[in-house]
């Protein structure tokens, strides 16, 4: 199941052994869970007042695990490149410590020096008998105009159909 909402039906599905890709709409994450973190493609290292849209960045970009099978069909290096532009503009940060501090994300958002939160963009866990893959990027809105979102969605859903989808952490 691919969903942008964690409702009672989705939780029941997970507890009974289902697989869920949770891809919330931009802005849908509560402040306590990371919603206060504003993402942008340029990092705060650069003077973002000079950027075209005066984006309000918060973080230093992302670090990925390019060898992780979830990204097998989404070409990437260990750091942010232009294929991540769309994800950063449509993404939500998730505070991993609020879920389980042991989670090692597939894609980590590098926080700034003021908060130094452990932030995830893509991570996985077990819930009951089921498995959840959380992608903080809204992969469902305006898909026909977002090639990168379609490809990332394809990569993640393909991964979920393999035996490699085997989260280590239970939440």
Language-model segments: residues:
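Solvent-exposed, acidic/flexible segments
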Residues: 3, 146-149
């Amino acid at each position: 199941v691919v969903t942008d909402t964690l409702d009672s039906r989705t939780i029941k599905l997970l507890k009974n052994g289902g697989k869920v890709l949770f891809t919330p709409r931009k802005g849908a994450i509560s402040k306590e869970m990371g919603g206060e973190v504003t993402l942008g493609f340029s990092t705060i290292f650069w003077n973002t007042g000079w950027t075209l849209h005066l984006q309000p960045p918060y973080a230093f970009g992302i670090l990925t695990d390019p060898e992780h099978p979830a990204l097998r069909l989404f070409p990437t290096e260990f750091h942010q490149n232009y294929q991540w532009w769309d994800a950063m503009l449509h993404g939500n940060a998730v505070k991993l410590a609020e879920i389980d501090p042991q989670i090692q994300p597939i894609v980590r958002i590098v926080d700034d020096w003021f908060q130094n939160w452990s932030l995830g963009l893509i991570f996985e866990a077990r819930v009951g008998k089921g498995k959840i893959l959380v992608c903080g990027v809204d992969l469902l809105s305006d898909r026909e105009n977002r090639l990168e979102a379609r490809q990332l969605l394809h990569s993640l859903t393909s991964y979920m159909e393999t035996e490699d989808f085997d989260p280590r952490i239970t939440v």
